[in-house]
UniProtKB/Swiss-Prot annotation:
Family: To group II intron maturases.
Pfam family, one: RVT_N
Protein name, as recorded: Maturase-like protein 1
InterPro entries: RVT_N
Keyword rRNA-binding: no
Encoding gene (name): mat1
Source organism superkingdom: Eukaryota
Subcellular location per the Swiss-Prot or TrEMBL entry: Plastid
Gene Ontology, cellular component aspect: plastid
Key words of the record: mRNA processing, Plastid
Broad class of the protein's primary localization: plastid
Gene Ontology terms describing biological process: mRNA processing
Length: 456
């Protein structure tokens, strides 16, 4: 009887129905939390955590999540089979409100810049509990977060940051008269006191105790691409809850650790900095003056690998270029591959193509037609290396060069189209919110938080 029930359970389970059911509950929780009804809010959070569907979906997401490296925890498990996941489901059913975490395993990884960083990897069962809690916490704080907090939301593209900067610095908003104050909170960012985070966190007491136990075990709150919680995004969610409220000090955009304040000619930057220091002192965080950068739009400024500069020739009086550091890192990555004698020309071309494609896709709204970003010198060097190989001649090396660098037809879209597309929704980021469950097979739902009308 037990084996028959298990086989029937595995065959009849539809993950589309599971995601639809959890999505409906999260949408209801979002509306209740926006009105800030505490009683219904806690009841809906407990219903989401106690659902069998949410537990099974959390186990499935942990088992099938693709990381850069399969990093096991202290127990040594990378994934669970069907019987182990079924036992974990039954264990979560009775112990989710009194969860005991195991020790975290220290693992050294390479960062995007080539630096060695130390990460603390939890066990699979602890990751499942974090997924389960995230289902109940994320819609609540999504309704209360500032609309210009773009640090962790997976449904927002990174190009929306360009749209917001264009909105604040275009000629229609007198952007040439404004200044920009850029802050970087990533240096020396260490949280010593978690009591302020527990006060901001909106969840039942049992979930708060579980998160506090996880933080006491040594779980680090950070925005990192190489973190084991890259898909879960639980660390960045808690850190966004911790830093929530800094966007209300002034008109700004926050993406992770980076803040960009837009200052009018009347605004005083010293008063703004005093407000920021006061806010960070309440959070028990240290902040250095070297991490502050004040610049005008005419001189230009760098933000997230882009360089924004005022220009009368462009449509919006604002030009976007790749930043100097971003361009140099891109060139060094290509030069390392070209100058490596262990690879042949065909392997070099296959390794160069995705790097060039990703870089041009990231800067598809930037002005790459300038001579500085035409890549003519690196193309000449690559052609010389390809031609020096005995197996290649002039025509074959020319075809390899075209395969590597000829991806500009797909990208380099007009910045005017981006700006016109930005003004289509009249109630941008105020009444209509976007929920995306991820994946190409799902639809994008826009719905009003007051009347509940769904816009497809």
């Amino acid at each position: 009887m037990i084996s028959f029930s298990l086989i029937n359970f595995s065959n009849n389970l539809s993950w589309d129905k599971v995601t639809n059911l959890i999505f409906k509950l999260q949408k209801r929780l979002f509306k209740v939390s926006y009105v800030y009804d505490r009683k219904k809010l806690y009841v809906l959070q407990k219903i989401i955590v106690q659902l069998n569907y949410s537990r099974l979906l959390a186990i499935k997401l942990v088992n099938h999540s693709v990381f850069n490296e399969n990093l096991p925890g202290v127990d040594g498990y990378v994934s669970l089979n069907f019987y182990e996941s079924f036992e974990l489901n039954e264990f979560l059913k009775y112990n989710w409100n009194n969860w005991i975490f195991q020790n975290l395993k220290k693992v050294s990884l390479f960062d995007n810049d080539g630096k060695i960083i130390v990460k603390k990897v939890p066990v699979i069962s602890d990751r499942v509990w974090c997924y389960l809690v995230k289902f109940a916490i994320e819609p609540v704080h999504e309704a209360l977060f500032h609309p210009f907090n773009l640090g962790y939301r997976s449904q927002y593209f990174i190009y929306e940051i360009q749209e917001l900067i264009l909105l604040n610095l275009s000629k229609f908003s007198f952007g040439s008269k404004k200044r920009v104050l850029k802050l970087d909170l990533s240096q020396n960012f260490c949280i010593n006191n978690y009591s302020f985070l527990m006060e901001k966190l909106i969840a039942p007491r049992c979930i708060k105790l579980g998160i506090f136990k996880l933080l006491e075990k040594g779980f680090v709150l950070e925005f990192s691409n190489n973190c084991i919680f890259n898909k879960v995004d639980f660390s960045s969610l808690l850190l966004n809850i911790f830093l929530n409220g800094i966007e209300k000090l002034h008109n700004c955009i926050r993406y992770g650790y980076f803040l960009l304040f837009f200052l009018n000619p009347i605004d005083n930057e010293k008063e703004l900095l005093s407000k920021i220091y006061l806010f960070l002192s309440k959070l028990d965080l240290k902040f250095n003056i070297s991490e502050i950068e004040l610049s005008s739009i005419i001189n230009g400024f760098d933000f997230l690998g882009w360089h924004f500069k005022f220009s009368y020739k462009s449509y919006n009086n604002l030009c976007i270029f790749p930043s100097f550091d971003n361009y140099n890192k891109f060139l060094t990555r290509i030069k390392v591959i070209i100058n490596n004698s262990n690879y042949g020309s065909i392997i070099k071309a296959s390794k160069i193509y995705p790097i060039v494609k990703d870089w041009k896709e990231y800067h598809k709204y930037s002005d790459l037609f300038d001579l500085n970003y035409s890549l003519c010198f690196i193309k000449k060097r690559a052609f010389k290396i390809f031609k020096s190989e005995s197996k290649q001649d002039f025509y074959s090396s020319k075809s390899l060069l075209l395969k590597c660098f000829s991806v500009f037809n797909i990208f380099n879209k007009d910045l005017k189209n981006l700006y016109n597309k930005f003004f289509k929704p009249l109630n941008f980021r105020h009444l209509v919110f976007l929920f995306n469950r991820g994946g190409e097979g799902f639809k994008y739902f826009y719905f009003c938080i007051h009347c509940g009308v769904i816009l497809l």
